[in-house]
Each structure stands twice: as structure tokens, then as C-alpha cells.
């Protein structure tokens, strides 16, 4: 809603099977209903100007690691903002750091994302 209040455009993309269990924001500029999670991710990737990763569960973790991997592979150059509130995502940063240290990865997550740890810093990104 904050993005809409400042003139931003918000597009929601939700698979049909999640419509009943999820809260759909009726204020979105547009809501797109798709059949599969893969279709959802494809549309989010195509339409997104940046990727904002909030604390979440297994679906969020899967989507986050995919978009991070795509950036590492050079598939996109869009900003990735990680809201690391109360160090929620610290273990993810640690995994990428360990991969680099162990020579299984070339990039640490810190170098390709914006790590935001406080609500005030998070809000300042959008003002």
C-alpha cells in the first residue's frame, strides 16, 4: 500500500490454488492469477524492476535463492534488497560466504545485494 500511496505501481501475481488461503491485496494496481508457481515466478521476474526479499517460509526461500542464483549467473542485473530484520537472513549470507571460502562459489551475497537490517533503513530506501 505504501508504494501505491507514493504513486508506485503494484502488480500481484498469485497461483489459483493459493487464492483461498492467502490474503490478496485488493488495492493492487493489477492482480494476475496464474496456474502454477513457475508461471508466477516468470511474471514476477519479467515485470519486476527490483527484487525485495522479506522474511518468509519455504516458498520465499526458494524464490530468493533462485533470483540470487540468476544474478550470480548474469541472467539479470536488477537490484536485490534483502530485509534482514533481526538477522533473519544471516544464515543465507553465511551459506554464500562459506561457498566462496570453500571455493564452491565466486561471489558472496553481500556483494550483489543490499542488506537492510533496520526498519528505518528499509523505509529510507523508498522515500
Give residue ranges: language-model regions:
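A cross-family phosphate/adenosyl-ligand binding-site feature
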Residues: 1-47, 83-127
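Short glycine-rich anion-binding loops that position phosphate/pyrophosphate groups of nucleotides
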Residues: 16-18, 56-59
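Short glycine-/polar-rich loops that comprise or flank the Walker A/P-loop
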Residues: 49, 76-78, 111
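Short, proline-centered helix/strand-breaking motifs
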Residues: 55, 74-84
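Short glycine/serine/threonine-rich phosphate/pyrophosphate-binding segments
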Residues: 59-66
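Glycine-rich, phosphate-binding/catalytic loops in enzymes
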Residues: 68-70, 99
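Arginine/glycine-rich "motif VI" loop of SF2 helicases in the C-terminal RecA-like domain
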Residues: 70-78, 104-106
Amino acid at each position: 500500500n505504501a508504494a501505491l500511496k507514493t504513486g508506485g505501481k503494484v502488480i500481484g501475481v498469485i497461483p489459483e490454488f493459493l487464492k483461498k488461503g492467502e490474503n490478496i491485496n485488493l488495492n493492487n494496481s493489477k492482480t494476475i492469477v496464474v496456474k502454477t508457481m513457475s508461471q508466477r515466478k516468470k511474471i514476477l521476474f519479467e515485470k519486476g524492476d527490483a527484487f525485495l526479499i522479506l522474511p518468509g517460509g519455504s516458498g520465499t526461500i526458494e524464490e530468493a535463492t533462485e533470483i540470487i542464483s540468476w544474478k550470480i549467473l548474469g541472467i539479470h542485473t536488477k537490484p536485490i534488497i534483502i530485509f534482514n530484520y533481526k538477522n533473519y537472513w544471516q544464515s543465507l549470507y553465511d551459506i554464500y560466504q562459506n561457498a566462496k571460502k570453500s571455493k564452491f562459489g565466486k561471489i558472496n551475497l553481500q556483494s550483489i545485494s543490499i542488506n537492510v537490517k533496520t526498519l528505518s533503513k528499509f523505509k529510507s530506501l523508498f522515500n
